[in-house]
């Protein structure tokens, strides 16, 4: 999805693995390459809740949302806090 990140749609297995509440929906970061420029912004277990005002329904959907703009607004949930980032893929 983004350079060095592996994400997956949140499901019950990933909720349990990362301690996510039942109502959390989106894409969870399940892998981060050490050399990824996004490693600090999107740590393991962070959930991409919204991209450009839309909740991603799949990895392909998220990719299309990111590619639709040169700079994208991304809201993530990490350690119980929602944070906002403007990123360039």
Regions found by a protein language model. Give the residues of each.
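C-terminal recognition in membrane/secretory proteostasis and scaffolding
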Residues: 1-89
């Amino acid at each position: 999805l983004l350079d060095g990140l592996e994400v997956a749609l949140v499901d019950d297995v990933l909720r349990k693995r990362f301690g996510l509440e039942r109502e959390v929906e989106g894409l969870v970061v399940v892998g981060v390459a050490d050399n990824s420029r996004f490693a600090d912004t999107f740590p393991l277990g962070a959930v991409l809740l919204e991209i450009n005002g839309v909740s991603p329904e799949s990895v392909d959907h998220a990719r299309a949302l990111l590619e639709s703009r040169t700079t994208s607004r991304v809201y993530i949930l990490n350690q119980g806090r929602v944070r906002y980032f403007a990123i360039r893929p």
